[in-house]
């Protein structure tokens, strides 16, 4: 590798919303915040969990859901 062209690779803490702290290394010098990790993800825990993240479909339904709700006969 060439000297002085690569970014600094530092140790950082990635904190999950459940409180789990993961130590990792990154070129990003600031701590990271994660939504899910292996301690709280439904795939790893086997529990169904509703995440508080609304997608584009939910946003569309909340704005335009009432327009197609009733059908005139």
Curated annotation (Swiss-Prot):
The keyword Transmembrane does not apply. Transmembrane segments: none annotated. GO terms for cellular component: ribonucleoprotein complex; ribosome. The keyword Iron-sulfur does not apply. GO terms for biological process: translation. Keywords: Metal-binding, Ribonucleoprotein, Ribosomal protein, RNA-binding, rRNA-binding, Zinc. Belongs to the bacterial ribosomal protein bL31 family. Type A subfamily. Binds the 23S rRNA. This is Large ribosomal subunit protein bL31. It comes from Pseudomonas syringae pv. syringae (strain B728a).
């Amino acid at each position: 590798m060439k000297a002085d062209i690569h970014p600094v690779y530092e140790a950082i803490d990635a904190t999950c919303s459940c409180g789990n702290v993961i130590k990792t290394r990154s070129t990003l010098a600031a701590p990271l915040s994660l939504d899910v990790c292996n301690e709280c993800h439904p795939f790893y825990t086997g529990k169904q969990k509703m995440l508080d993240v609304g997608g584009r479909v939910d946003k569309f339904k909340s704005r335009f859901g009432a327009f197609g709700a009733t059908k005139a006969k």
